[in-house]
């Protein structure tokens, strides 16, 4: 039986023998494509080639691509763990042809690999072909069917509709018919009873698609019409985990050697055997799947967070923790302990897992611990809602409350339903679904982008000349109109542009496009989309066919360049001061500020921050000249000392920037010499995730302003101390005096409180046999609370304390304390306070024995106190 490692290598070996260039997997986290957060198919890294924006370096390519599908069209998240073949992170084996071979070779080689090389039973294989679509004038794909007829009988070549057998990149763009290969893994007895033909595309767990061959031959325009592609593309994708299942004779992907090591480790950790119970089995599958996704995302530079791609990763991690908490009884962080097993399983194919081991482990552990605390808070909130419902006789938790638990505390509906069922209650699922739909609609509206078709004025590739020039003569190659969030603008592609498109953390250039008559049109930003430099303009030139001058805003560019070069010097200084474990984890470079994220497991000391600043400043004063090396082979660049960053996609040739001993792989723009940075100051140093720190810094004019602001503060403080030459001594003396005075005040307050409490205890006011303490005073609410708890600790009889306090001005408070016997009898301080708070224009709450309310209408205190007395039946 082939192992998963052997299967992966056999695929690469086979297609290498067919003249394919074997390329490494692209990062799972996508940069430079606004339509995608994650790589969800093998074709993503070749999208710019398929769109015609970049010329293919190789016409035949194959790889094993790590993918993630959790959102949008490919939303598999809720299926994961509940069936045998859905995953969040999976590997896609694929082969591509860019204008080389087409359907014949794609089909013949797929069959040869599956049957001849791997030895799959041909009697278990089926192929689907596109049946055609008369509405769009598309005929049946008889060409593909004829090639399949070489290997399969006619009855196992199945017509498929547009939904299943016509692949589209999106609403617009390259598309075409596809041919899926399905395999029937059922036993001979089952196959004899029901023909596999009846189960194709019917979600049967053992009659599954394993390979999709896409024949891209059309381009879908914005008006939905189709035009032929000038260069046809083959794009195939085969689910690696499903292939392993078929070859290893399993009935579930999770029973293969891809997942079983993780599941066995999990069983050992929890003491729960896999196969003992369906709910714990689902939980184990969820955890085994999700730990892979989370680890690879962190490896590729995407940390869990509350925004965009980071939020998706956090959701996946929390889903795994919830399943572990609910069904595997994991009350402490546990997922990070699976990392050694994952590395043993996949570390050979993806060595970055081992290289980033400590960071991945720390990030996951901290995220788990944080969410477990949140989970406990959510459970307490749900318990309160259950108690409130029981008090009113309701047995149904409303959908809004259930959705709040989901949205705020990460409670899935099934966990809420489980806890409710244990308390004889149910949840309003319809109301929950309504709230979920509202949220999805809000998200869709916020992210909706409508892009028209490209208006192509001239054919040709766009050239970037911004490393050498700040203005160039150019022409418009193409443009299109875009609508987003009720705003309209144009995307413009130029034949030759000095504008740097936002990439690698550096913001895009702004500037002007100047026509032949001298009229300037603003370019407010430049973005990178599918390997195109796209210039954003609110208004198009009147004549788009003119020759133009493209001119960047040089001041902003130069400031951004200074900040970008400073990040290189900062990176080197951090590694010198903190150690070589420091690696860049992200950056942001604008004309105003630079932000640098790096791996490090502790807060930097003031001395370390000062040392880093000094090292960067030394290199600025040294005025190192920029040494630039373009089109350097990646291995040669690394031999020069440049470090490749995890999560970045590099070509075979790269650009190297050198300033003194600082050597970096970088595609950004940089100043000619370090002296032009002028000055460098670190503004903040903070944590953004476990094991990842962030420095924000300023350079040049920004650094000068930062220093001036500090000086202004210092001068203002000196002035407050009458320009005393020994300012630190004066401040220390003031703090000592302040502490002494505060202690005297606290002692006086305490003494006053004791006297006031004594006077209360000397009174003996009783109503219905209950001792009543009633007062309205100018006093802090905290003092009233102290009095209440001291009296409660000293008395052994029934009592009620009601206090109305003001601190001067409009602030006021109500305080109510009840003895234990009264709360056991049904009296509730929180309800009394909430009811009376309206008189003081405030609100409050608490527990049955003690509650407070704050308000802004002291004149209402007498009425509030009277209402409490009335409701407690303690009036005269």
Swiss-Prot record:
Free-text comment on this protein's domains from its UniProt entry: Consists of three domains; the N-terminal catalytic domain, the editing domain and the C-terminal C-Ala domain. The editing domain removes incorrectly charged amino acids, while the C-Ala domain, along with tRNA(Ala), serves as a bridge to cooperatively bring together the editing and aminoacylation centers thus stimulating deacylation of misacylated tRNAs.
Gene Ontology MF terms in the entry: alanine-tRNA ligase activity; aminoacyl-tRNA deacylase activity; ATP binding; tRNA binding; zinc ion binding
InterPro entries: aa-tRNA-synth_II/BPL/LPL, Ala-tRNA-lgiase_IIc, Ala-tRNA-ligase_IIc_anticod-bd, Ala-tRNA-synth_IIc_core, Ala-tRNA-synth_IIc_N, Ala-tRNA_ligase, Ala_tRNA_ligase_euk/bac, DHHA1_dom
Function: Catalyzes the attachment of alanine to tRNA(Ala) in a two-step reaction: alanine is first activated by ATP to form Ala-AMP and then transferred to the acceptor end of tRNA(Ala). Also edits incorrectly charged Ser-tRNA(Ala) and Gly-tRNA(Ala) via its editing domain.
Annotated GO CC locations: cytoplasm
Co-factor binding comment: Binds 1 zinc ion per subunit.
Organism lineage: Bacteria, Pseudomonadati, Bacteroidota, Bacteroidia, Bacteroidales
Compartments, record wording: Cytoplasm
EC number: 6.1.1.7
Keyword Cell wall biogenesis/degradation: no
UniProt-listed HAMAP family: Ala_tRNA_synth_B
Catalytic activity: tRNA(Ala) + L-alanine + ATP = L-alanyl-tRNA(Ala) + AMP + diphosphate
Family classification: Belongs to the class-II aminoacyl-tRNA synthetase family.
Keyword line: Aminoacyl-tRNA synthetase, ATP-binding, Cytoplasm, Ligase, Metal-binding, Nucleotide-binding, Protein biosynthesis, RNA-binding, tRNA-binding, Zinc
GO biological process: alanyl-tRNA aminoacylation
Amino acids binding Zn(2+): 564, 568, 666, 670
Enzyme class at the top of the EC tree: ligase
Gene3D superfamilies: 2.40.30.130, 3.10.310.40, 3.30.54.20, Bira Bifunctional Protein, Domain 2, Threonyl-trna Synthetase, Chain A, domain 2
Pfam families from the UniProt entry: DHHA1, tRNA-synt_2c, tRNA_SAD
Protein name as it appears in the record: Alanine--tRNA ligase
Source organism: Porphyromonas gingivalis (strain ATCC BAA-308 / W83)
Cofactor(s) this protein requires: Zn(2+)
């Amino acid at each position: 039986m082939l192992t998963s490692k052997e299967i992966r290598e056999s695929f690469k070996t086979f297609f290498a023998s067919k003249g394919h260039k074997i390329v490494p997997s692209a990062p799972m986290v996508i940069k430079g494509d606004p339509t995608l957060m994650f790589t969800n198919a093998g074709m993503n890294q070749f999208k710019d080639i398929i769109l015609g924006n970049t010329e293919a370096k190789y016409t035949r390519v194959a790889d094993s691509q790590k993918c993630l599908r959790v959102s949008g069209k490919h939303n598999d998240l809720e299926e994961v763990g509940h069936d045998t073949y859905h995953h969040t992170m999976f590997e896609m084996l694929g082969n591509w042809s860019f204008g080389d071979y087409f359907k014949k070779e794609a089909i013949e080689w797929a069959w040869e690999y599956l049957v001849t090389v791997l030895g799959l039973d041909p009697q278990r294989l089926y192929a689907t072909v596109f049946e055609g679509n008369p509405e769009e004038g598309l005929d049946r794909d008889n060409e593909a069917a004829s090639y399949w007829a070489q290997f399969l009988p006619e009855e196992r070549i199945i017509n498929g509709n547009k939904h299943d057998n016509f692949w589209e990149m999106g609403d617009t763009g390259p598309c075409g018919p596809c041919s899926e290969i399905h395999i029937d893994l059922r036993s001979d007895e089952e196959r004899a009873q029901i023909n596999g033909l009846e189960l194709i595309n019917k979600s049967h767990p053992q009659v599954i698609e394993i390979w999709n061959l896409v024949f891209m031959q059309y381009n879908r325009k914005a008006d939905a019409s189709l035009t032929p592609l000038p260069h046809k593309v083959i794009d195939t994708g085969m689910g690696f985990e499903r292939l392993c299942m078929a070859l290893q004779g399993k009935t579930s992907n999770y029973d293969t050697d891809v997942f079983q090591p993780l599941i066995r480790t999990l069983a050992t950790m929890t003491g729960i055997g896999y196969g003992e119970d369906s709910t714990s089995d689902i939980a184990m599958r969820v955890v085994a799947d999700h730990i892979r996704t989370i680890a690879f995302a962190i490896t590729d530079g995407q940390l869990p967070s509350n925004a965009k791609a980071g939020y998706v990763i956090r959701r996946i991690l929390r889903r795994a923790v919830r399943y572990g908490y609910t069904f595997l009884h994991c009350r402490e962080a546990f997922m990070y302990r699976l990392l050694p097993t994952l590395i043993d399983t996949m570390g050979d194919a993806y060595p970055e897992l081992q290289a980033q081991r400590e960071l991945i482990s720390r990030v996951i552990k901290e995220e788990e611990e944080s969410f477990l605390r949140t989970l406990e808070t959510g459970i307490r909130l749900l318990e309160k809602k259950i108690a409130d419902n029981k008090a009113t006789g309701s047995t149904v938790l409303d959908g809004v409350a259930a959705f709040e638990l989901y949205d705020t505390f990460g409670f899935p509906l099934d966990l809420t339903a489980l806890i409710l069922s244990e308390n004889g209650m149910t949840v309003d699922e319809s109301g929950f679904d309504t709230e979920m739909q509202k949220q999805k609609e809000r998200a869709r509206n916020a992210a909706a982008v409508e892009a028209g078709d490209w208006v192509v004025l001239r054919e040709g590739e766009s050239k970037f000349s911004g490393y050498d020039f700040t203005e160039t003569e150019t022409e418009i190659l193409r443009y299109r109109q875009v609508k987003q969030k009720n705003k309209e603008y144009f995307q413009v592609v130029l034949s030759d542009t000095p504008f740097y498109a936002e990439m690698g953390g550096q913001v895009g250039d702004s500037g002007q496009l100047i026509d032949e008559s001298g009229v300037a049109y603003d370019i407010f930003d430049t973005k990178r989309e599918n390997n195109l430099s796209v210039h954003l303009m609110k208004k198009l030139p009147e004549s788009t066919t003119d020759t133009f001058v493209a001119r960047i805003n040089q001041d902003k560019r130069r400031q951004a360049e200074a900040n970008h070069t400073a990040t290189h010097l900062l990176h080197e200084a951090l590694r010198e001061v903190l150690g070589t474990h420091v690696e860049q984890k992200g950056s942001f470079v604008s004309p105003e500020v630079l932000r640098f994220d790096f791996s490090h497991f502790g807060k930097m000391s003031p001395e370390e921050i000062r040392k880093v600043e000094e090292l960067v400043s030394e290199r600025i004063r040294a005025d190192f000249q920029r040494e630039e090396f373009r089109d350097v082979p990646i291995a040669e660049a690394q031999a020069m000392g440049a470090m490749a960053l995890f999560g970045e996609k590099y070509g075979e040739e790269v650009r190297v920037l050198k300033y003194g001993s600082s050597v970096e792989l970088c595609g950004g723009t940089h100043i000619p010499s370090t002296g032009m940075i002028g000055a460098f100051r670190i503004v903040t140093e903070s944590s953004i995730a476990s094991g990842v720190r962030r420095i924000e810094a300023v350079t040049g004019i920004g650094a000068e302003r930062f220093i001036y602001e500090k000086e202004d503060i210092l001068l203002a403080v000196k002035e407050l101390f009458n320009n005393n030459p020994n300012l630190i001594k004066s401040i220390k003396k003031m703090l000592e005096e302040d502490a002494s005075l505060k202690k005297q005040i606290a002692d006086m307050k305490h003494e006053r409180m004791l006297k006031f409490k004594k006077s209360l205890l000397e009174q003996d006011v009783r109503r219905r046999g209950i001792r009543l303490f009633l007062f309205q005073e100018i006093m802090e609410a905290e003092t009233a609370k102290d009095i209440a708890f001291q009296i409660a600790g000293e008395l052994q009889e029934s009592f009620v304390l009601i206090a109305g306090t003001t601190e001067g001005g409009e602030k006021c408070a109500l305080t109510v304390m009840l003895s234990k016997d009264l709360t056991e009898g049904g009296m509730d301080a929180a309800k009394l306070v909430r009811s009376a708070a309206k008189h003081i224009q405030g609100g409050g709450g608490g527990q049955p024995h003690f509650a407070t309310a704050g308000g802004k209408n002291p004149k209402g205190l007498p009425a509030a106190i009277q209402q409490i007395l009335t409701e407690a039946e303690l009036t005269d």
